[in-house]
A protein has these predicted regions:
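Mid/C-terminal beta-alpha module of Rossmann-like enzyme folds, strongest
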Residues: 199-253
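C-terminal amphipathic/interface module of NAD(P)-dependent oxidoreductases
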Residues: 252-287
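Glycine-rich "substrate-gating" loop/helix at the edge of Rossmann-like oxidoreductase active sites
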Residues: 125, 154-163, 183-194
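N-terminal Rossmann NAD(P)H-binding glycine-rich loop of SDR-like oxidoreductase domains
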Residues: 3-23
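NAD(P)H-binding glycine-rich loop region in Rossmannoid oxidoreductase-like domains
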Residues: 34-93, 99
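Alpha-helical substrate-binding/gating segment
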Residues: 170-180, 185-216
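Conserved beta-loop-beta element that borders a ligand/cofactor-binding pocket
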Residues: 95, 136-159
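Active-site "gating" loop of Rossmann-like NAD(P)-dependent oxidoreductase/epimerase domains
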Residues: 97-126, 137, 141-144
Length: 287
């Protein structure tokens, strides 16, 4: 199949594109061209700026694909600039579990219905969750829902994570730096970059539509992360109101996501314990 990947040269886009290539698809990467990818002659490349509709039009107008995988849908205008000018049979949007407005265990896909919200055409708002909700809603202005997939992941972890969020805990605990944490005991879900990327690639060849959750089995708290680092580096975490805000502190109560729909495709998610602590070991070594 002819597949356009918008974004995808870093983090979990790497295993995603690798899997698409391995499965024999004809892959075109559309990026701003700011980062060198590692795919060589296995892919074609288009340069565009998703936030500039004229750039998107110049790069994609008149082009058609079997599938578009949109990894940079942060607002309704992001989606409009793309789907207004590129044609596809199937649209897979990298959404987020941030679209859900309640926190509890086993959150299901139907707890956020993009059709239920008012569409507003906005550039990328400061409110990340709002932008993601509107991005889902905007897609339905251009595509039938049966031809759309909205992939909802929690925080993605992995060796290629460039955000520095997991490193924050190792750096602060091992370095004796204070952290500000309010919700230390609340547990939540994560997913590893390899499974995140390979799951999206798998969706290309399925008939699934609508929203789909994807996350590792098991949930962990900041206390779990901190306790492991404390034991490994032999230092106690300094928790202080004047400390730096911890990146995973936005979870107020235990929450997880029901992945029955994803698992019905035969995709198996690993347990978070199979990779979290090795990632923490790596972060500790780098301090």
């Amino acid at each position: 199949m002819k597949i356009l990947v918008v974004g995808g040269t870093r983090f979990f886009g790497i295993p995603m594109v690798k899997k698409l290539i391995a499965d024999g698809h004809e892959v075109t990467l559309a990026t701003r061209g700011q980062h060198t990818d590692r795919f060589g002659s296995s892919v074609q490349r288009i340069t565009l700026d998703k936030t500039d509709e004229s750039s998107v039009k110049a790069a994609l107008c008149g082009k058609s694909f079997d599938v578009i995988i949109d990894k940079v849908a942060y607002s309704s205008n992001d989606v409009r600039s793309l789907l207004k000018h590129a044609l596809c049979e199937k649209y897979i949007q990298m959404s987020s579990c941030a679209v859900y407005q309640s926190e509890h265990l086993n959150i299901t896909e139907n707890e956020f219905d993009q059709k239920s919200i008012e569409l507003k055409w906005l550039d990328r708002p400061a409110d990340y969750a709002l932008g993601k909700r509107l991005a889902e809603r905007a897609a339905l202005e251009f595509m039938d829902e049966k031809n759309c997939v909205f992939v909802r992941f929690p925080v993605v972890l992995g060796e290629n994570d460039y955000t520095g969020r997991l490193a924050f805990y190792a750096q602060h605990i091992c370095g004796g730096l204070p952290m500000h944490i309010q919700n230390i005991n609340a547990k939540t879900s994560y997913i590893h970059e390899t499974q995140a990327g390979e799951f999206i690639a798998k969706l290309v060849d399925t008939d699934i539509s609508g929203a789909v959750n994807g996350c590792s089995d098991g949930i962990v708290s900041q206390r779990d992360i901190i306790g492991y680092i404390e034991k490994k580096c032999g230092k106690q975490a300094i928790i202080s109101q004047s400390g730096d805000n911890a990146p995973y502190d936005d979870v107020c109560s235990d929450k997880s996501y029901d992945c029955t729909k994803a698992k019905s495709l035969g995709f198996a998610f690993s347990d978070i314990s199979s990779y979290l602590y090795s990632l923490l070991d790596n972060e500790i070594k780098q301090v």
